[in-house]
């Protein structure tokens, strides 16, 4: 057998294709490659039987394609396949081909049998066993085997011609194969199916090996038989069948012989060509490869197949007329036959697809298998892509809304301090400056930025095209002339959500310059924050423009504004006095605005401006003075070009929003300080220590034997089991918390104003959920909002141009 294998696989080298290993024989190289290079296992020929071993990388397991056999050692699966599936594979392939021959030529059965014994007693022996087997297999394979049969006959004729050596080893298997073919012809194919299956398995691995060994002769035989294959249908076909060798090579015959057979018989070979000569080439080296497709069905599947009904096989043959296909192509050639086969034994089919698509592709027509099984890899890649796309969508939406030019964002920071000075009231600034407030506020800042500030949404609001910004800036220039009017215009025109903007602007108008410092920003933040991030930015920006950034307006507008500013500022002051109370309340409501963003955004120049603004706030300058200072800064900064001025305006707008946020954050800090003081008054560590102690890295409950690694677990235990009062209580609502961090988050939520969606009636106190809603609502109403904004901005732009 070994000699035959060597003869059959002269092209196969004893060297490993992936390293410098050189084996003593083919099996040695196979075991080396499977053990040392398992990642290439799917493309390896298992004992010359085809790509029957699948390597599962995740579990580091080797699987048999034809059954459920699994092992962590390649050698175990290799020997399993050579022992269990070598003979059965040959038989499964041959019977398929033979039944097809039988169907094509019902007269030929007897001649092949006679010829087989004549050729060799060994052949004669297999033939008797084959009749039963052939009968069994023929029913299941009838169409396929029949189709394959003629080509097999051709190889038979050529087989003997090829060489006596291959014939000798192959004859037993071939004879058995040929004999089964005539038997199925004689007997009804349906009844014969089980028998054929058995003989397929029955043929000793030796016969299989011999058949494999005579892969070259099959080639010749196939070529010579090309003409004979059609004749196989006629009485000549039995004659061909008589030569056991041709049968061996043709059925289990190396893929090479099958290739010529395909070429020889135009119809059957056509389907087999579908498999592609390349696939067949590997098969010659691995006579089992053709078997693999059948193995894919698995011997188990073959058995059920016959009982199930020859129909599936028939359908498969119809799918593949070629005798060779009957063995392999049957599965690949037509999805239909494959489906029935799985129904016969779903188990084997499942493992096969789960195996590697590569192996399936090689064994079966690559096209058909690729599409149905789609390797798990393809599925994986697919879903991740979907996931990726889905994930990016949300950020993209946010970004799309934000499309504010980076320039606008950048310039903003330096202006923010200015905004702070005019916008923030001295009182607010003082607390913010105080270290205590800042210390406490950072937590709130963290929460607030995540909650109230949606940097992306804000960007998106800013993201409105520069034209919108320009228009808003122009509106600002108009604002100094008539604060109330300009505010209204800016609110309607510049804010992305006109409705929200108008609402926000109204309070702003009522508020005076000073109240704006402390309150205007917080109020707009309230209105703006609830509004979609876009409304926030624009609403905030228009406000900042109105109050603080009038100077940022174009020079011409700024000058006129500066002249009118004092008068307006006086009026605003009067309004501020009236609205100061409301502003203070609003400020208290805005606790969650983030300071971190403001600090990061501020540049050294902004810090200087901040100092100046703080001094002004300390002096409690009038709003007119603030406006003048702003105008001066704008004059100094924006004397370059109109475009530069516009950029400055954008920056100032961005930072006016930040100023508002800072104001809110300072208020938050105040609340937090109060809370911490009250909390300490509530309960002290000493009181907690009464019920809990720490030792050896663990916390112990003094009331019982409970102990835990973390303090929080023991606190929960004390509260739930021993009714100990929670150490941290909220002074606003009285709710108790076990951990200080939980209480801080709760208090911060109290400080936050109710978030309202500008596009619908949605309201929420939870910034995280509100942000999710905004993403949904924005994507839904984005187009409508953009249209409205464009329309609103067009009118102010036209006025400015005039």
From Swiss-Prot:
GO terms for molecular function: zinc ion binding. Keywords: Acetylation, Centromere, Chromosome, Cytoplasm, Cytoskeleton, Isopeptide bond, Kinetochore, Metal-binding, Nucleus, Phosphoprotein, Ubl conjugation, Zinc, Zinc-finger. Residues 135-148, 369-378 have a biased composition (Polar residues). The modification Phosphoserine is found at residues 108, 204, 207, 234, 237, 243, 252, 254, 265, 272, 276, 298, 309, 334, 345, 365, 375, 394, 405, 416, 421, 425, 432, 434, 441, 448, 451, 461, 497, 502, 532, 603, 605, 617, 622, 641-643, 665, 726. It is found in: Nucleus; Chromosome; Chromosome, Centromere, Kinetochore; Cytoplasm, Cytoskeleton, Spindle. The keyword Phosphoprotein applies. Interacts with MAD2L2. Interacts with POGZ, CBX1, CBX3 and CBX5. The lineage of its organism: Eukaryota, Metazoa, Chordata, Craniata, Vertebrata. The modification Phosphothreonine is found at residues 371, 447, 593. There is a cross-link at residues 479, 555, 596, 660, 679 (Glycyl lysine isopeptide (Lys-Gly) (interchain with G-Cter in SUMO2)). This is Chromosome alignment-maintaining phosphoprotein 1. The modification N-acetylmethionine is found at residue 1. Residues 88-475, 603-625 are annotated as: Disordered. Residues 332-351 have a biased composition (Pro residues). Residues 581-802 are annotated as: Mediates localization to the chromosome and the spindle and negatively regulates chromosome alignment. InterPro entries: CAMP, Znf_C2H2_sf, Znf_C2H2_type. The keyword Metal-binding applies. The gene is Champ1. Residues 440-580 are annotated as: Mediates localization to the spindle and the kinetochore and is required for the attachment of spindle microtubules to the kinetochore.
């Amino acid at each position: 057998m070994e000699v035959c294998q060597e003869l059959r696989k002269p092209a196969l080298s004893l060297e490993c294709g992936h390293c410098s290993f050189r084996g003593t024989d083919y099996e040695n190289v196979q075991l080396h490659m499977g053990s040392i290079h398992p990642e290439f296992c799917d493309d390896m020929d298992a004992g010359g039987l085809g790509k029957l071993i699948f390597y599962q990388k995740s579990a580091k397991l080797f699987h048999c394609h034809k059954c459920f056999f699994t092992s962590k050692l390649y050698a175990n699966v290799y020997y399993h396949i050579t022992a269990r599936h070598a003979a059965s594979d040959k038989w499964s392939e041959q019977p398929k081909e033979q039944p097809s021959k039988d169907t094509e030529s019902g007269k030929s059965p007897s001649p092949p049998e006679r010829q087989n014994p004549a050729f060799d007693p060994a052949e004669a022996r297999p033939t008797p066993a084959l009749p039963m087997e052939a009968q069994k297999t023929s029913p299941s394979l009838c169409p396929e085997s029949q189709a394959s049969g003629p080509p097999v006959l051709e190889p038979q004729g050529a087989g003997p011609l090829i060489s006596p050596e291959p014939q000798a080893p192959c004859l037993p298997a071939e004879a058995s194969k040929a004999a089964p073919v005539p038997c199925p012809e004689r007997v009804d194919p349906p009844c014969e199916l089980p028998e054929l299956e058995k003989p397929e398995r029955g043929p000793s691995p030796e016969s299989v090996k011999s058949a494999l060994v005579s892969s070259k002769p099959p080639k010749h035989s196939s070529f010579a038989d090309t003409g004979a294959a059609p004749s196989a249908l006629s009485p000549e076909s039995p004659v061909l069948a008589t030569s056991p060798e041709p049968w061996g090579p043709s059925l289990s015959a190396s893929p090479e012989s099958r290739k010529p057979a395909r070429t020889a018989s135009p119809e059957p070979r056509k389907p087999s060509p579908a498999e592609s000569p390349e696939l067949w080439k590997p098969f010659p080296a691995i006579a089992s490869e053709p078997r693999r497709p059948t193995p894919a069905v698995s011997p188990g599947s073959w058995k059920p197949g016959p009982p199930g009904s020859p129909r599936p096989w028939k359908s498969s043959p119809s799918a593949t007329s070629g005798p060779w296909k009957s063995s392999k192509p049957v599965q690949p050639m037509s999805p239909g036959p494959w489906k029935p086969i799985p129904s016969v034994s779903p188990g084997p089919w499942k493992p096969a697809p789960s195996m590697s698509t590569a192996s399936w592709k090689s064994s079966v027509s690559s096209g058909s298998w690729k599409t149905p099984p789609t390797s798990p890899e393809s599925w994986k890649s697919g879903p991740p892509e979907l996931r990726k796309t889905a994930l990016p969508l949300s950020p993209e939406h946010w970004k799309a809304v934000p499309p504010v030019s980076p320039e606008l964002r950048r310039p903003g920071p330096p202006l923010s301090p200015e905004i702070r000075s005019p916008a923030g009231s001295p009182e607010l600034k003082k607390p913010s400056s105080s270290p205590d407030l800042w210390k406490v506020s950072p937590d709130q800042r963290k929460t607030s930025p995540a909650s109230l500030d949606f940097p992306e949404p804000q960007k998106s609001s800013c993201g409105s095209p520069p034209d919108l910004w320009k228009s808003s800036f122009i509106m600002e220039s108009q604002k100094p002339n008539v604060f109330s009017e300009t505010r209204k215009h800016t609110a309607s025109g510049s804010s992305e959500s006109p409705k929200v903007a108008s609402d926000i602007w109204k309070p702003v108008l009522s508020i005076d310059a000073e109240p704006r410092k402390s309150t205007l920003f917080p109020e707009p933040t309230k209105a703006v924050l609830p509004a979609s991030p876009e409304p926030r930015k624009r609403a905030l920006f228009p406000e900042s423009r109105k109050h603080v950034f009038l100077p940022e307006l174009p020079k011409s507008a700024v000058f006129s504004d500066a002249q009118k500013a004092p008068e307006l500022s006086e009026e605003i002051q009067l309004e501020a006095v009236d609205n100061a109370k409301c502003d203070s309340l609003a400020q208290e409501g805005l606790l969650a605005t983030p300071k971190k963003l403001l600090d990061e955004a501020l540049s050294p120049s902004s810090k200087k401006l901040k100092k100046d603004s703080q001094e002004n706030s300390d002096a409690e300058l009038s709003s007119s003075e603030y406006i003048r200072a702003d105008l001066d800064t704008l004059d100094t900064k924006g004397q370059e070009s109109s475009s530069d001025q516009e950029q400055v305006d954008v920056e100032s707008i961005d930072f006016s929003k930040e100023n508002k946020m800072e104001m809110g954050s300072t208020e938050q800090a105040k609340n937090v300080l109060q809370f911490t003081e009250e909390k300490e008054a509530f309960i002290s560590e000493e009181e907690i220590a009464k019920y809990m102690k720490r030792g050896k890295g663990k916390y112990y409950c003094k009331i019982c034997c409970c102990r835990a690694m973390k303090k929080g677990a023991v606190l929960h235990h004390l509260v739930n089991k021993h009714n100990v009062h929670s150490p941290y209580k909220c002074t606003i609502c009285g709710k108790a918390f076990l951990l200080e961090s939980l209480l801080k988050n709760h208090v911060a939520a109290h400080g936050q104003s109710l978030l309202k969606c500008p596009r619908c009636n949605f309201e929420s106190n939870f910034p995280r959920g509100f942000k999710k809603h905004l993403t949904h609502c924005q994507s839904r109403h984005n187009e409508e909002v953009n249209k409205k904004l464009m329309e609103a901005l067009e009118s102010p732009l036209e006025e400015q141009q005039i």
